[in-house]
């Protein structure tokens, strides 16, 4: 009654975990009539409608995060996190969370394919000057806006993030 694969006048796109890739989303054509008071389990509406947020796969071998500034709705296989860390831009945090360092940390510290908020909160995030963040964000934007194969861009960004941790 609420979910549909057909776009109608009273529904909107809803994302599942499998719709989330690193840095991006590929909606699979699912729509929802958003009536939160009728749902069994729903996050606070402000989280869905936040000006910017990160979406991530709840179940995944490695952390997979995407940036959303379109107030997109999501099902419970696609969780929301809104990093509010003084001095750190959200897209910078996105790059850190999508890095091989974060994946390694999660794999060694937690024995689970479920990525919990408490796991994310324990990932150490390098505090860097704004010019370094801007450089990272430019590359994140390139990855997010590219229609070409982004594996090379991703590897270069990941190498730089490894350096931010002093691990190179």
Region roles according to the model:
Residues 1-134:
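Polybasic, glycine- and aromatic-enriched phosphate-binding surface used to engage nucleic acids
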């Amino acid at each position: 009654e609420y979910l549909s694969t057909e776009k109608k006048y009273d529904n909107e796109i809803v994302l599942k975990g499998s719709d989330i890739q690193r840095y991006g989303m590929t909606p699979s054509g699912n729509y929802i009539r958003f009536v939160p008071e009728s749902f069994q389990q729903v996050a606070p509406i402000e989280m869905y409608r936040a000006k910017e947020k990160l979406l991530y796969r709840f179940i995944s071998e490695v952390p997979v995060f995407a940036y959303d500034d379109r107030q997109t709705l999501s099902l419970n296989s696609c969780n929301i996190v809104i990093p509010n860390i003084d001095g750190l831009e959200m897209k910078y945090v996105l790059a850190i969370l999508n890095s091989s360092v974060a994946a390694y940390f999660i794999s060694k510290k937690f024995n689970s394919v479920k990525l919990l908020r408490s796991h994310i909160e324990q990932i150490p995030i390098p505090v860097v000057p704004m010019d370094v963040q801007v450089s990272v964000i430019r590359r994140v934007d390139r990855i997010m806006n590219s229609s070409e194969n982004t594996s090379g861009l991703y590897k270069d960004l990941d190498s730089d993030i490894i350096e931010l941790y002093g691990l190179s």
